[in-house]
Amino acid sequence: AAAAYIAETGRGWLESLTIVKEVFTEADQILPKSIPGSLFKGSLEVLKYLSQAGIKLGILSADNITAVQNFIKYYQLNDYIQIAMGVNDSPSKPDPKLFLQACQKLGVKPVRALMVGDSPTDIEMGRKAGAAGCIGIYWGKAEANYLQGADVAIANLEEIKVF
């Protein structure tokens, strides 16, 4: 989300992502993380719903695996998330290897998987990996132009339904 804000100032997405990574890396060295990032409103309920529907779920993050595992533990998502991967598991987004490795570990072909993400690099990763589709999530912001490569853009996870 921080990279999206920087990109809105006119910088390119990859430049914005690089700036954010550098800033957060420096901040992580100075300040200890006591609480992981926030869980968006309604996310827990949607994860429960999708898990109960038999959907295999994973978190693929540009953060390191320790931070991802701390996030899952803090928000008690272990019952819903089958795989968690961070950048120290694989090259970072938008490289498709992260998505492909997750699909392999889940026993799911990429053409049978969806990528749900809130950044252009999420969407690009899904496209490059051959995902069945890419859902961009803009978390209710006024504009979702930065997700233009997605098959569909949604305001929140609650818009995802299983039929």
Description of each model-found segment:
Residues A1-Q29, Y49:
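A metal-dependent, Asp-based hydrolase signature
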Residues Q29-I59, I65-Q69, P96, V111:
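Short, acidic loop-to-helix structural element flanking the phosphoryl-transfer center
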Residues L44-Q52, C103, I123-K128:
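Surface-exposed amphipathic alpha-helices with a cationic face
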Residues N78-Q82, K109:
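Conserved H-loop
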Residues I83-P94:
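Glycine/Thr-rich beta-alpha phosphate-binding loop at enzyme active sites
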Residues K93-I123:
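Conserved Lys-Pro-Asp/Glu-containing loop-to-beta segment of HAD-superfamily phosphomonoesterases
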Residues M115-I154:
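Acidic, Mg2+-coordinating phosphoryl-transfer loop and its flanking beta/alpha structural elements
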Residues I160-F163:
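Short amphipathic alpha-helix with an adjacent loop that forms part of the alpha/beta core around
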